[in-house]
Every structure is written in structure tokens, then in C-alpha cells.
């Protein structure tokens, strides 16, 4: 191959790798934040309607999640862990915690789930971002970095639209559906 053909072929491979990195991180953030943190928002009216929670307890659940996110964000600075492992575990735990919200109606279980879920979403956000940005820098593909951060918005829009379409099925089905 000529130097130009080699350069073009290498560029194509790097572009494909960069796209995969950015989209993978975007999906991770959509799940961790869009579902793990913010699915509660479109589900809260259904929880209020079916009487499983009142507005005061809904506020407490949101506060537990915020506290967990704060704890998770602060502890990221001291955790010395494999980023990929944290992201994979964070996504799996997000699935489990989301399903748990739909299979119980015990407030203190919900509170614990929201607290832990907040920390997990922070860890997943920070470590997926760090890994993705470092990998994009290695590929000299900085232009893809913004795609990563569309993930939370994609997740929030997705959960909102899905609940608008399937809200008649109830909050429990919504939680379980988002978890699966």
C-alpha cells in the first residue's frame, strides 16, 4: 500500500474505534443517569396516583438519591479501581436496583435503593467519562467527546417518552421495564 492508502486505512479504523468508544460511553451514561437517576421523575406521578407514596416521601427518595450521588462523586477522587470494571458493575447494579424499585413497596428499601443508586450513577458517570475521554485522546479523536455527554439527555428523554406511552401500565411495571 502507498503511504496515503495506509494513512486513510488507519484513519478509518481510528474513526470506527472512536465512534464505538463515544457511543458505548453515551449508552453507559444513558443507563446510569437517564434510568438509574432520572427514571424516578416520570414515575413519581404514577407512584403518587397509585398511593404507594406521598409527595413528602417522594421528596425524601429524591434526596436520598442526591445524597448518594454526592457521596459517589466525592469518593471517585479516592477510589483506585479499574474503570472498566466499575462501569460494568455499575450498569449491572443499576439494572438490579431499578427492578427492585418495582418489586417492593417498602419505603426504607426504596430509600436504600435510591441512596446506593445515586452513588452507583456517579461512579459510572465519572469512570465511563474518564475511560472514554482517555481512549478518544489516544485515538486523536477529541471531536467525538461531546457524544459521550449526550447520554444522560438521551436516557432522560427515553424514560420520559416511554412513560408517556406506557404510563397506563403503572409505576411497578415502569420500574421493572426500565430495569430490563
Where would I find each of the regions flagged by the language model?
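Helix-to-loop junctions at the C-terminal end of transmembrane segments
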Residues: 72-84, 167
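Pair of pore-lining "gating" transmembrane helices in MFS-fold secondary transporters
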Residues: 17-45
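Short amphipathic helix-loop junctions that connect adjacent transmembrane helices
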Residues: 42-56
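Helix-loop-helix hairpin linking two adjacent transmembrane segments in secondary transporters
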Residues: 109, 139, 146-180
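Structural signature of the two symmetry-related core transmembrane helices
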Residues: 85-100
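Helix-breaking motifs and short loop linkers at transmembrane-helix boundaries and internal kinks
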Residues: 52, 103-109
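Short hydrophobic/small-residue motifs within alpha-helical transmembrane segments
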Residues: 65-70, 153-154
